[in-house]
Swiss-Prot record:
Catalytic activity: thymidine + phosphate = 2-deoxy-alpha-D-ribose 1-phosphate + thymine
Gene that produces this protein: deoA
EC nos: 2.4.2.4
Family named by the database record: Belongs to the thymidine/pyrimidine-nucleoside phosphorylase family.
The protein's name in its UniProt record: Thymidine phosphorylase
């Protein structure tokens, strides 16, 4: 390397960021290429992440970092598929009982959109869409690119796992952040989320950023800051993006787990049962997707179209096609109960006193699912798809001897008792209940 290239030494780039200087696009590209091809060491990634953690990045730097990480591997090009509608997707920062993807993809597909969704596994207390789908026997989350494209074209939606060739630089950066206390930084979170999503070749994206006791970000202000960063950076990187801020101060669906949430998703799609909060949050995300994809002129028209495909069975039909196309049973929607794992003990847990439900520690409820084996403590853990909770009480409702906190799905008495103790301490009975909206606000490109 000649002296004239010395400014592109990784340690010089780290030094400039450490000293609060603004990095150029070329410097960021050089560093991230080095991450992808292993010429930048883990120690250098750690130092770079810590420098960003303390010095932050400007919006142009965030856009450059996101694009560099997106372009570090394969970027899917759908043009050869000749889709006759927009390619749209949604990403959630994760929560408990957040099963929206399973209904949202088929609903948008039934309205004319194409949703090639690359999803993740559970992280900490949050459930993972992939783990839920793997509760369906035969469902393949790692199909070939050909099958991914074919199912997306035929069903309008395919939900699969991240392959190693999409945003490989993010994989290395994230693994290092995870062990160096640099996870919770807006610039790094923005680039990590968007590099993976934008590598999927999307035309538009809706970002669902959670707020509250089960949210990834600790405060409303932090959630709003992340949402604004994602909208600004994604639009700056060339993908039309809107964010919505939604409530995670209680479990979103009526259930939390894997098979229990898939069961709820199918019942939602067929109209057997629709939890009102889950319906509102799903509708809000879907409506933004239809507007961004120019499939509706405004959210009011979008909601009408979405309600129609729920009512006429087209959304449920798309879900069935996706499941069958990715290796699951062809009659899954009709006979889901035959295929989903069931726990040996399904019994209610009651509050220790009567009173109004005033608060939920949603994070603790998510960790209770993990404790039962419904999530992972380490990446190699196997998941028990049968365990979890359903029929959750809602904030503002009254718990008494007739109204339990939830039904526990457990493998044995000891597990049931541990889960019961966890729920009783995570759900507050008595005191003042302050209602929160299901959807706080939308953040669109013009808002940032």
């Amino acid at each position: 390397m000649s002296l004239s290239q010395a400014k592109y030494l990784p340690q010089e780039i780290i030094r400039r960021k450490r000293d609060g200087e603004v990095l150029t696009n070329d410097e960021i590209n050089f560093f991230i290429q080095g991450v992808a091809n292993n010429t930048v060491s883990e120690g250098q990634i750690a130092a770079f992440a810590m420098a960003i953690f303390f010095r932050e990045m400007t919006m142009p730097e965030r856009i450059a970092l996101t694009c560099a990480m997106r372009d570090s591997g394969m970027v899917i090009d759908w043009s050869h598929m000749n889709f006759d509608g927009p390619i749209v997707d949604k990403h959630s920062t994760g929560g408990v009982g957040d099963v929206t993807s399973l209904m949202l993809g088929p609903m948008v597909a039934a309205c004319g959109g194409y949703v090639p969704m690359i999803s993740g596994r559970g992280l900490g207390h949050t459930g993972g869409t992939l783990d839920k789908l793997e509760a369906i026997p035969g469902y393949n989350i790692t199909p070939t690119n050909d099958v991914f494209g074919k199912v997306t074209k035929q069903a309008g939606v395919a939900i699969i796992g991240q392959t190693g060739d999409l945003a490989p630089a993010d994989k290395r950066v994230y693994a290092t952040r995870d062990i160096t206390a640099t996870v919770d930084n807006i610039s790094l979170i923005t680039a990590s989320i968007l590099s993976k999503k934008l590598a999927a070749g999307l035309e538009s994206l809706v970002m669902d950023v959670k707020v509250g006791s089960g949210a990834f970000m600790p405060t409303y202000e932090a959630s709003e800051e992340l949402a604004k960063s994602i909208v600004a950076v994604a639009n700056g990187a060339g993908t039309n993006t809107t964010a919505i801020l939604t409530d995670m101060n209680q479990v979103l669906a009526s259930s939390a787990g894997n098979a229990v949430e898939v069961r709820e998703a199918v019942r939602f799609l067929t109209g057997e049962y629709r939890n009102p909060r889950l319906l509102e949050v799903t509708m809000a995300s879907c409506a933004e997707m239809l507007v961004l994809g120019k499939l509706a002129k405004d959210t009011a028209q979008a909601r009408e179209k979405l309600q129609a495909v729920l009512d006429n069975g087209q959304a449920a039909d798309r879900f069935g096609k996706m499941v069958a196309g990715l290796g699951g049973p062809s009659d899954f929607v009709e006979n889901y109960d035959k295929y989903l794992a069931k726990a040996e003990i399904i019994r209610p847990v009651y509050a220790q006193q009567s009173g109004v439900i005033s608060a939920m520690d949603t994070r603790a409820i998510g960790m209770a699912v993990v404790g039962m084996g419904g999530g992972r403590r380490v990446a190699t853990d196997r998941i028990d798809y049968a365990v979890g909770f359903d029929q959750f009480i809602r904030l503002g409702e009254i718990a008494d001897s007739n109204k339990p906190l939830a039904m526990i799905h457990a493998r044995n008495e000891e597990q049931w008792q541990q889960a019961a103790n966890a729920l009783q301490s995570a759900i507050k009975v008595g005191g003042d209940y302050l209602p929160t909206p299901d959807v706080y606000r939308q953040i669109r490109a013009q808002d940032v």
